[in-house]
């Protein structure tokens, strides 16, 4: 009898132990499917946000990279001179093709439109409302030149901003027989003064220059100033109507 009672007690304890393990514990609660789904969606949002931020940063970095393909070149005028820019920004011609002052960046800023920048000075060649050439620290509409191939395979550079209003004749970059720069409205495209032969040295990548208003730039000292940089002039036949007096 005692053995039977012991066996019964042992059996009862075993059954109670098995029932205890089979019963879900209060501390071990099942997580609701909706909660899991919310956590999953939250993780996805975090992942997509990080991917988007990374993509934006990558695009910003790409925008900062140079994207314009231009050339470093010398510009040989048919008059027998190389165009050069002195350290103070003054322009003229020289027969010496070994000096760094004759190196220019030809940067495409539009369809057959270029900016001409001195390699050593970093200054842009610009033409003002009276046809004078001057150096500009900032890239403005006066720094844009249309690049056209003439019938003799020389290249001519004309101002994108100024021309004769009555005839529509363009104003050109040019050197005279003494190697001095000429007023744009005095240069004819059929004359050797306007004919340049680019002699590329290397292909280079450039960042697109930021366009500034003409009035923002200040001409370098000792160089013929641009009247239109001091005051915005209303153009009439290539001449400013209102001039700003200088002292």
UniProtKB/Swiss-Prot annotation:
Compartment list: Nucleus
Any one cellular-component term (Gene Ontology): cytosol
One Pfam family from the record: FGF
GO biological process, one term: regulation of synaptic plasticity
Region annotation Disordered: where it falls in the sequence: 1-37, 216-247
Keywords: Growth factor, Nucleus
Molecular function GO terms recorded: growth factor activity; heparin binding
Entry-linked InterPro entries: Fibroblast_GF_fam, IL1/FGF
Tissue-by-tissue expression: Brain and testis; widely distributed in the developing nervous system. In adult, high levels in the granular layer of the cerebellum, less in hippocampus and olfactory bulb.
Annotated SMART domains: FGF
PROSITE patterns: HBGF_FGF
Biased composition (Basic and acidic residues): 15-25
Primary site of residence: nucleus
Signal sequence segment: none
Subunit structure: Interacts with SCN8A.
Family indicated by similarity: Belongs to the heparin-binding growth factors family.
Job description of the protein: Probably involved in nervous system development and function.
The protein's name: Fibroblast growth factor 14
Origin organism lineage: Eukaryota, Metazoa, Chordata, Craniata, Vertebrata
